[in-house]
Amino acid sequence: MKKTEKIKAPLTKGVAKVPVIMQMEALECGAACLAMISAYYGKWVPLEQVRADCGVSRDGSNARNVLVAARSYGLEAKGYRFEPEALRTDGQFPCIIHWDMEHFVVLDGFQKDKAVLNDPARGLVSVSMEEFDRSFTGICLMMEPGEQFAPGGKPKSVLEFARHRLK
């Protein structure tokens, strides 16, 4: 990122254009979501590093560990409990939400009668508000760059990704 470029601010309306970062293992959804949020703001951290920083274990990671890791990257990070409609009107996007009692996804925002999710297991998906109401557990992790945030790193190329997966 050039020094003249401004760091993005969270959105309160519309849909954020968040890079898709797919999880490599079922238990690293929280880490992959944090990697996506960090990349959105301009800091590309390898998923392997985010995994370690989130303390991903055989049980996955929890919201608290994701928040601690986010703060270590210079993000101001807080956890909230929201009703679905309140998140739609009062939320900041992108944010990480807990989904179906067992998964984390990035909520990029809302578009008409759909919620736009960046799911580290499936990619970019839109779901109806009915499905959103059913699956969103109410847990929301909001993050934005703080004073200590420093953009940097670069996205992995497809070749690097394939080489790592084929080892």
Language-model-derived ranges and their functions:
Residues 1-167:
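Membrane-integrated ABC transporters
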